[in-house]
Amino acid sequence: GLGDVYKRQRPDTQLYIMDALERYIHDFSSPEEELLHELDRQTHLQVVQPRMLSGHIQGKLLELLVRMLRPRNILEIGTFTGYSALCMAAGLEEDGVLDTVEVDDELEEFAASFFRRSPHGQKIRQHIGSALDIVPTLGYTFDLVFIDGDKREYPDYYRMLMGDGGSKVLVHSGSILIADNILWSGKIVEPVAHNDRHTQALLEFNRMI
């Protein structure tokens, strides 16, 4: 099959194909908004590990999903610099609320500065700290959850949302759960080192869902 052909290709060929596919998708997508373009650029200039930013294609997909699903309450675990939050907020109806949680307090003002400049920023409630501590206190049942936080905590995020241990269930039967990086650049199908907690946690999370 095509998967076997792809696996037999040299790594540099695989990278070329992935880059070409990304350019192709970009060419057939709506243009990136000016504020988001600036956010992307400033993230690459000022922030460590800028590749963690969702980016234009993923952002447009998230916005589209929000427009289609029409959630009232969205939870994002892992704000980073705020790109994905702004994209989801753009698709959110005016009376909707997006709670976004980031553990790194050094990113708080960076993201907040772009939220303030966006016409959709008033829909966003920004929280700094551990999602496992903050989310249960928010008082919402969430219609849509986007998980893009610490990969080692993905199983704990899921248990929290499902109310394991007798705590309140934070989702309902029609809620949508979106989790980023669950294939982890293919590491989930390779031998896993005993100290690779990120991949181990993602494997556990994938089995749970």
Regions found by a protein language model. Give the residues of each.
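Short, small-residue-biased leader/transition segments that mark boundaries at the very start
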Residues: 1-6
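Class I SAM-dependent transferase core
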Residues: 8-75
